[in-house]
């Protein structure tokens, strides 16, 4: 029984250590390197701040994005607009110009460039 408890504690300690290391790396990228967002192996985490994607994604939800080179219509994307990080659905793609819209909105937003997409 002691071996089982010891094994479980070791696994938990390992998981906690990994989470702390990842958190420290994220903080390093944002605070020290002054990046707008952190990226680990092509993945980034973002907390949704508005209800523009409701009911698909709610305020306070955390989205995980993966850096990608190809996006298609109806994909949910995260992109940088100035200093704002926005999560919207891709409505139309015309060359390098992309039209997005939040699921809770009827109006289209100004076109963005594909290079603005985070994931």
Predicted regions: what they are:
Residues 47, 76-78, 99:
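Residue-level detector of beta-strand face positions
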Residues 68-81:
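Short coil-to-beta transition motif at edge beta-strands of beta-rich domains
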Residues 86-119:
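Extended, hydrophilic extramembrane loops/domains of integral membrane proteins
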Residues 41-43, 58, 72, 85, ...:
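Extracytoplasmic
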Residues 64-70, 89-92:
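Short linear motifs in intrinsically disordered
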Residues 1-61, 66:
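Protein maturation boundaries and topogenic segments
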Residues 54-56, 70, 108:
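Short glycine/serine/proline-enriched coil/turn segments at secondary-structure junctions
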